[in-house]
Amino acid sequence: MLHLKVQFLDDSQKIFVVDQKSSGKALFNLSCGHLNLAEKEYFGLEFCSHSGNNVWLELLKPITKQVKNPKEVVFKFMVKFFPVDPGHLREELTRYLFTLQIKKDLALGRLPCSDNCTALMVSHILQSELGDFHEETVRKHLVQTQYLPSQASLESKIMQFHQQHIGRSPAESDILLLDIARKLDMYGIRPQPASDGEGMQIHLAVAHMGVLVLRGNTKINTFNWAKIRKLSFKRKHFLIKLHANILVLCKDTLEFTMASRDACKAFWKTCVEYHAFFRLSEEPKSKPKTLLCSKGSSFRYSGRTQRQLLEYGKKGRLKSLPFERKQYPSQYHERQCRSSPDILSDVSKQVEDLRLTYGSSYYRNVNGVHASESMLDSRRRNSAVEVTFAAELEHSKPEAEATSLHPSQSSSSFTFIYADPVFNTDPEPIEFFEERSPLSSFQTTSKFADSHTSKASPARQLTYTDVPYIPCTSQKVDIMPPQVFFYVDKPPQVPRRSLIMAEENMRPDSYVDHSAIKPAKRSPRNMRIKSLQQDLQELQEAMARTSGRSNINVEPEEEDPHLDDAFAYNLQEQTPKRSQSQSDMKTIRFPFGSEFRPLGPCPALTRKTDLFACTFAEQEFPTVLIDQSSAERYVASESSDSESEIIKPDYYFLYGKGTKSPRARIRLSSGSLQLEEEDETISFATPGAEDRTLLKPCNYFLA
């Protein structure tokens, strides 16, 4: 087996393994397959022969017969045939490779032209490689990369032209560069030193039109293919036989002397391939060998001709395959990429934190999925996306706000926003809002009520909240107060209801001496106690109607050893309220148990703090009564999520398993937050999450 090294036009190298007896076509096909190149006939593999001449690898000849030490030779993948019009190139990858070849020719000084033309071509290369103009980036890149032999004197012109290319894609820059290069005299020219019959030093070259004679960089004669009758070589003499012209008395055979026989033979082979590729309609067939010794070389061109390539491309048989352009580190300056490393590093660092945090046994929201802890976001840095997002939200606040937004302390951190928890005391569910409201929580609707009359209620702005589950303490209470997160604008005001009286009212054998309360003094405390008693009666009636029992006694859970940890959370930074004018907030209401979840493990863009420690810090018994007037209950059944039976709008279930419902996810798409729903649920909860009774007080969604 042979291990052969190939160097491509972007200076990358790859080693291919071929058989010992493989021909050059095997290595060439492997190289083109590595690039996913369809129009491969324009290219070839060049190497330095043992005589020191650069020659093309023959496709029909074994590699070992062309190269003495194949393992020590580097084959260069280069453009072999330059079409007269680069517009004939169908594929973007082909044009990109031609651009890389033009770039190499400019660096080697093979494309002499005026300073303006040279600077313009380099500016197109910079636009393709670096993108839009940025002075500091372009200046540093020109210092590190040599595009021209004398580049320092043209840097100002290059940068001046580069400023005019803002908004052009790399593919457009490639087309413009090739259009300029094709008009140059030395486009696609590989001159070979020679001398004429009089001993004058000249250069010979071959192009799509025929054989050229040059003196320096100036063409002094052109022999078109139509005029040439035969091309041959004898030792180091190259012979051109022309068609006889009766009108003009001239020689029909021209002889040129080249440096060596190998150089002369290599140039002759190149002329044969150029003539076949540009002039023939199909690949020439091999000549049958005679029994007797035949005179002359049997070399021929192998591959599709240009006409076949064009016809093949017109029929749409060439498949465009994706490719990757060479990237330069200098094209990403600080302003463009400072957020990307931050986000990626946060994702990798927080995967374990997410698993540990969501694996806790006592911190769970109403859907059985663990809510995020404050420690998760405390170690996370704010990326540039969040900085921009916070700044935009600060300037896009709605005109009518229920509360005032406190200014943030820094541009890179979010401010947290609070609102008062409002307990709905209406005994009937409220009407469904006809108009769309921004970022509203799950709202009730009379359309799904079971023959219940509904009263018109003034529309109030609803905000999204998350209600994690917290186990009860040793106090004999029915319902524990959830840990509430509010995305509104001011610190919460603790409701001044007597929690001790609430506890007494929840007990069936409790007795409250109302005679001790003076009826003449109507204090707010007495009014709240009376309202509390009414709420308790309504709660018992509603629970009796739904469960079919007159008395409901919920046994208290065992004392949780982690209860102290639940009260030990500290307030984090404040998060901004989303503006009503944002285009991505298009949902009227959130589905039951909806929450923001990203498409994969990624840093959260919002932070939440717990209101539990702030609200009940001074209370001895952390209990509160929850109004059940406007709630919706989903009955757990064996059917799918979409077939869950709705008993009453906005009613929560007390027994059994809660049904799963679609959750809202965040998809980062162009700096905006798009909410979409999906049916599948991704839970980081412990295995016992589904077996626990979940409480969902709906009135905590109202603010």
From Swiss-Prot:
Stretches of the chain forming a coiled coil according to its record: 525-552
Record's note on what induces expression: Up-regulated during retinoic acid-induced differentiation of neuroblastoma cells.
GO CC, one annotated term: cytosol
Residue span(s) of domain FERM: 2-282
Gene, per the UniProt record: Frmd7
Species this chain originates from: Mus musculus (Mouse)
Annotated S-S bridges: none
Subcellular location, record wording: Cell projection, Neuron projection; Cell projection, Growth cone
Top-rank taxon, per record: Eukaryota
Keyword Metal-binding on entry: no
GO biological process: negative regulation of stress fiber assembly; nervous system development; positive regulation of lamellipodium assembly; positive regulation of small GTPase mediated signal transduction; regulation of neuron projection development
Transmembrane segments: none
Entry keywords, A to Z: Cell projection, Coiled coil, Neurogenesis
Protein name: FERM domain-containing protein 7
